[in-house]
C-alpha cells in the first residue's frame, strides 16, 4: 500500500473513531448555526434546577451502553454501538460502521469491510483494522494511536478531538445545556417507547457569561475553551431524560472547524460493566511506527 494511502486510511480511522466517542460521551463536538428559538434569551429556572440534579446523578453511574450515528460534512457518516465508562478517564469498546464519506472510501481502499472495532483507554486508543489492512503492515491487525499524536495526525480536527476525548463524559452535554441562556423544557416525548422529558438549548460562544449561565466560573471557562478550540460559534443541544433522571438520548448539530457536524446518541444500561484491555502486543503496531517504516518508500 502506498504511504499516502496508508496515511489516509490510518488517520481517517483514528479521527473517525475519536469523533464517535466524543459525540457519544457528549464532548461538545457539535455547534449549531440555527437561530435562537422563539422566546430565547432567558433560561427557565425550573429546567435549570432539574438539569443540575440530572447532571449530578449522571456523574455517579459511571458507565452506559450507547448506540448512535455521527456525520461530519462529506468526511464521514457512521454508526456506533458499544459501551463506555468514565470512572477514571474515558474508556470503552465500540464497533464503528462507516456508511459514507471520504473516510469510508479511504478504508475501502485499504481493503476494509466498512467496520472497525475500537478500544479506548486513558491515553490511547486501538483499532482493529481487519485482515486485509493487516496484510499490508506485516500481519498485525491492531493499530495503536496515542491521543497526544492526534494533532500531528489530523491537524486542527485532531487537536480538538484529543481535548474532547480526554475531557468527555455524558455530563458534558448537560453542562452545555446549563451554559445556555435559553435552556428550557421542550415537552414530553417517548424515546424508543420510554417516556422522557426533552430539554433544549443553544449555546452562543459570544454570549457565554456568568450572568446568563447556570455553570460556575471554572466550568464556564472550560466550556468556552472547548468551543473556541473547535471553531464553534453556536452549539445546539437537545437531551431527553427518562423518569429515572438519566439521559436516554442526546442530539448535537451545527458547524465546527472540521465541518458540518450532527450526532444522535441513545443511552441505556447505565452502570453496565466496562472492561477494556489492550490487544496482544504481538498483534499490535503503533501508527507512527508504520509511517516511519514507510517514510523511505514511495509516496
What are the language-model segments listed below?
Residues 20-23:
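C-terminal motif of bacterial Sec signal peptides marking the signal peptidase cleavage site
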